[in-house]
């Protein structure tokens, strides 16, 4: 399909149409947060490293790239309509992406796609529940896992979405919870500070970093310091 990008008036005046050109996948995750998308990428990679070779394929996209109606229509045509499950984590409710939600809901109903829309601000939203096609109990589990953050919770959320879409996903092992404080090392991952300290008599340097590095599974900069 060819998309002609021309000057337009009245349609998201500050936005320019974008063709993400994503190939179809089993599951598609959309969010305005790069931290969300980074965690889901790490969660999917975790599934693969645990020899889940048949784990569903995924595509990740930032909703900031899908603000223009042409961008939405193109992404639906190329990617979303071929998916088995779609998860959207939205901040601000329906008004922040009303055209996209309406169009994706229609395509999900037409193609029997498991469609979940969850709020990213920690509050319940009945409008998003009504737009979604999966049970409210599934929405709450997905919301809880996304609010926890980190690669294990993201792995679990992907598995939950896969099951809702009728795809196979193995049970997810490992602790999903992330404490408000704690320790992390490349060797032990999340752990008790006493374990991180170990019994090595050599002096150690304490590196302090934000918890959000863990919830976004963005630990490469920290790991590089070890």
Q: At which residue positions do the language-model features occur?
A:
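An N-terminal assembly and electron-transfer interface module characteristic of large anaerobic redox
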Residues: 1-226
């Amino acid at each position: 399909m060819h998309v002609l990008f021309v000057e337009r008036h009245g349609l998201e005046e500050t936005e320019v149409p974008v063709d993400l050109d994503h190939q179809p996948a089993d599951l598609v995750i959309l969010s305005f947060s790069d931290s969300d998308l980074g965690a889901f990428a790490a969660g999917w990679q975790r599934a693969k490293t645990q020899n889940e070779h048949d784990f569903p394929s995924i595509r990740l996209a930032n909703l900031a790239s899908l603000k223009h109606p042409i961008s939405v229509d193109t992404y639906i045509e190329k990617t979303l309509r071929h998916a088995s499950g779609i998860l959207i984590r939205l901040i601000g409710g329906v008004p922040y992406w009303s055209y996209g939600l309406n169009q994706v809901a229609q395509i999900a109903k037409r193609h029997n796609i498991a469609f979940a829309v969850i709020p990213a601000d920690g509050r319940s939203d009945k409008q998003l529940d009504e737009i979604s096609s999966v049970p409210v109990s599934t929405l709450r589990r997905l919301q809880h896992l996304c609010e926890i953050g980190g690669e294990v919770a993201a792995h679990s959320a992907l598995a939950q979405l896969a099951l809702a879409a009728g795809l196979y996903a193995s049970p997810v092992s490992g602790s999903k919870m992330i404490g408000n404080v704690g320790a992390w090392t490349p060797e032990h991952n999340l752990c008790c500070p006493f374990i991180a300290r170990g019994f090595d008599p050599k002096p150690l340097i304490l590196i302090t970093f934000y918890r959000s590095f863990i919830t976004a599974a963005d630990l490469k900069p920290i790991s590089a310091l070890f």
